[in-house]
Curated annotation (Swiss-Prot):
This is 5'-methylthioadenosine/S-adenosylhomocysteine nucleosidase. Its EC number is 3.2.2.9. It comes from the Bacteria. The lineage of its organism: Bacteria, Pseudomonadati, Pseudomonadota, Gammaproteobacteria, Alteromonadales. One of its GO terms (molecular function) is adenosylhomocysteine nucleosidase activity. The keyword Aminoacyl-tRNA synthetase does not apply. GO terms for biological process: L-methionine salvage from methylthioadenosine; L-methionine salvage from S-adenosylmethionine; nucleoside catabolic process. The active site is at E12, D198.
Amino acid sequence: MKIGIIGAMEPEVAHLVESMENPSSTTIAGIEFVAGQLAGKDVIVTRSGIGKVTASIATTLLIEKYAPDVIINTGSAGGFADELAIGDIVISSEVRHHDVDVTAFGYEIGQMAQQPAAFIPDAKLVAAAQKAVASLGEVKAIEGLICTGDSFICDPVRTKTMLENFPTMAACEMEGAAIAQVCHQFGVPFVVIRSLSDNANNDSPVDFDEYIVKAGHHSALMVIALLKQL
């Protein structure tokens, strides 16, 4: 099995790349792909850059050039679940865009035209992630809705609106739904795994800068533990 792993930022992929055997790096359109072995599996770790456009480009290039059997999106997110703290993990039960609105044409809020309202992760990958949780010690993990948009969320008014639109949202970030949509169109199984770097409030910019390394490391550890379950 060949596994594609995508993270947006250096702190989100650094531990994965450092842990790889026989790494070989290629850069295409400013996006870095590192192929090698991790936890006994053939992997391609991809640093996509931030946001939905670069994530879509990275995912398409990853699929076209390396043909992975599955794709895992790892990294940080803002938290919305009361039971989670910074550093805890959300495993996607579904992934949606939060900044798409074509409801005038009869679609759900967050649903892109001619696309499903929600992108559903692969059940086997989710099950493997659930089993991997036990190896993380004090880090807590839940399954939940992860929403994606091209904004860093730190405005309470915007947070309120998002929760009105997506009341079960556990986390929000800036790449997952784009990656999921590309995987959907190519027929590649996926899962999104995010560790919380902030709580999507007024303190989020400060929290993010302080905790991005911790969140990226926790998410990377979760991915490595997941690989051992495959």
